[in-house]
Design a protein with these regions (language model features):
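Bacterial Sec-dependent N-terminal signal peptides
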Residues: 1-24
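Serine-esterase "nucleophile elbow" of acetyl-processing enzymes
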Residues: 19-73, 102-103
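Structural recognition of the beta-strand scaffold that forms the well-ordered cores
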Residues: 28-33, 37, 68-73, 109-115, ...
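Surface-exposed cleft-lining segments at the edges of enzyme active sites
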Residues: 40, 79-83, 118-135, 173-177
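Charged, often glycine-rich, active-site loop that binds/positions anionic groups
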Residues: 75-98, 219-230
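Oxyanion-hole/transition-state-stabilizing segment in secreted/luminal serine hydrolases
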Residues: 87-134, 163-164
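Substrate-gating cap/lid alpha-helix
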Residues: 163-209, 238-241
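Histidine-centered active-site loop/cap adjacent to the catalytic His
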Residues: 225-257
């Protein structure tokens, strides 16, 4: 009798589960970044900035109910500007997430970060040039403080994207700056590995493919800008912002699956 009951239960259970809908994910995302995140050089950054298009990309994917976001990208900023101790831009990031959380209390909290472009400059931006070890220390300080305030939040760290080796506007980047930028990649990987030991399942390596992609497609997807060392390429145009958003979106989507 017991065996017969178990057999009937096993046969019926898949149909019962099939009828149950898994709840879709709602996200609160705060984007941390510089002019690229902000949408500089775009005609309509409110509609075209990478964070806006990342949200649009995510909302087209299965399993996503709603994405609420705040764009905290600010032109010219470095990891130094976002350090908690500076009490300048870090409080704004924290307040942005608190506002999203107050309005959408059941949503998953996620910080999407792409910093490093201005850190890598030879001169100009605050704290530049930032060495690779110092970059690690700065990003860790930002994450640690945010993690204290939002213990369940997820963190997705994207590689800062490529720029042309003659980039020189108000800040000087050039070849040495680009090499410094690329030295940050291993630091991000090290950070993720370290957090995996202490806070497993919270800090993830985000997009790693955009730098190589834009190095190949910069003529079509970056705005040409006149600089002190000729025409340089630093900021994505509308098409480039869409491509970057897709890279970010895929990385974030993989994390929440």
């Amino acid at each position: 009798m017991v065996k017969k009951f178990l057999l009937i239960w096993c046969l019926c259970m898949p149909w019962c589960l099939y009828g149950q809908k898994v709840k879709d994910v709602e996200l609160n995302i705060v984007f941390i970044g510089n002019s690229i995140t902000q949408g500089a050089q775009l005609k309509d950054p409110v509609q075209e900035a990478p964070p806006v298009q990342t949200v649009q990309w995510l909302q087209k994917q299965g399993g996503i109910d709603r994405v609420n976001m705040s764009n905290q990208g600010v032109s010219g900023l470095t990891t130094v500007d976002f350090l908690p101790a500076s009490q300048t831009f870090f409080p704004k990031v924290k307040m942005a997430m608190e506002a999203l959380q107050a309005e959408h209390p059941d949503a998953t909290l996620l910080f999407s970060m792409m910093l490093g472009t201005n850190d890598s400059a030879n001169s100009g931006p605050n704290g530049s040039p930032v060495s690779a070890p110092q970059y690690y220390t700065n990003v860790k300080a930002i994450i640690d403080e945010l993690m204290d305030s939002f213990p369940k939040a997820l963190f997705v760290l994207h590689y800062p994207i490529w720029y042309s080796p003659n980039t020189y506007n108000g800040a000087q980047y050039l070849v040495t700056g680009l090499k410094r930028l690329q030295s940050y990649y291993s630091q991000l990987q090290a950070l993720v590995n370290d957090y995996a030991q202490k806070h497993p399942g919270q800090v993830f390596l985000g997009d790693t493919e955009a730098p190589a992609y834009f190095e190949t497609h910069y003529l079509e997807e970056f705005n040409p800008e006149q600089g002190r060392a000729g025409i340089f390429y630093l900021h994505p145009n509308k098409k480039g912002a869409e491509s970057l958003a897709a890279f970010w979106g895929k990385a974030i989507y993989e994390v929440i699956q």
